[in-house]
Amino acid sequence: MTDWVQLLIATATALLGALGLAYWAYRAQSDRSALVGLYLLFGIPAVLLLLAGTAVLVRGDRVLGPMLLLIGLGLGLPLLRPFREALARVTPLDPDSAIDMTGLSIVLGLLGLFVGNSLAPMADDPPELIPSVGIVELLVQAAFLVAIAYIAVGLPYWRDLRAATERLGIVAPDPRTIGIAIAATFACFVVAAIAGLVSQQFDPGLSESLDEVVDQITAQVQNPIGAVVLGASAGIGEEAIFRGALQPRYGIIIPSLLFMMLHGPQYGFNLALLGLLAVSI
């Protein structure tokens, strides 16, 4: 019961925080004081992290120091207009948008965190102990990611439900879309197979280790219903946030990198993630 309460409290807190930040960014589009507040919200932690990371790195910590620096850079770089303008040349990002700036700070900050984690000793090895997930946890995770995706594209502030759904690209598939999806599925299997062969050549024991990790994660859902829920929850939730919300604004590379690094703590920061990146792209 305690785990359920903690899960619900954490989920509700994150959603309320996302709603508050989305409204703040929306107000910052036309309210200069709100925009200044956003710069302070991300800029102060960024500066402190950069200073702390530099100090820790000078003292010889080659793991925590770079991690703090990367997170600080991720939070702080989007606040610099030249950085946003440079990124806007290769992505659909609007350099004048406070909303885009806010989202980019969060995305790059998270990316810095996960890249920093990959620098830890033995980070490339799959973890030995991974808690398994149940059907309810998967459903809550999917609902949470979908809710975050809707909030990220403006619900309920600058888009209504219909407009937000259209912005996320959630529509009934037509025959052409179904055909593309089937072809893409086969292509993903090919890419995954190639990645498996490459990892087998360079790290022969990796495949067996990953199989053990997957077995641990899916221990509670190794049944027909669990398999359907596992596939649907991951597909719906992750596609909504990465493909629906992030990719149309930040291009395909940044969301794909975040998607790849997000799975590092589960599978280890190793060659398997390169295959995941290729599949994601």
Feature map (PLM): residue ranges:
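Juxtamembrane helix-loop-helix connectors linking adjacent transmembrane helices
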Residues: 2-5, 89-107, 111-144, 153-233
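C-terminal halves and exits of single transmembrane alpha-helices
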Residues: 72-83, 106-120, 188, 257-263
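A cytosolic-side transmembrane-helix exit/cap motif
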Residues: 57-58, 84-93, 271-273
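Transmembrane helix-loop-helix hairpins at the membrane interface
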Residues: 1-37, 50-58, 185-281
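A generic, lipid-embedded transmembrane alpha helix
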Residues: 40-57, 109-117
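Alpha-helical transmembrane segments
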Residues: 6-13, 59-74, 130-148, 184-185
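Membrane-water interface of transmembrane alpha-helices
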Residues: 17-27, 67-89, 148-161
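Membrane-interfacial loop-to-transmembrane alpha-helix junctions, especially the N-terminal start
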Residues: 32-42, 98-103
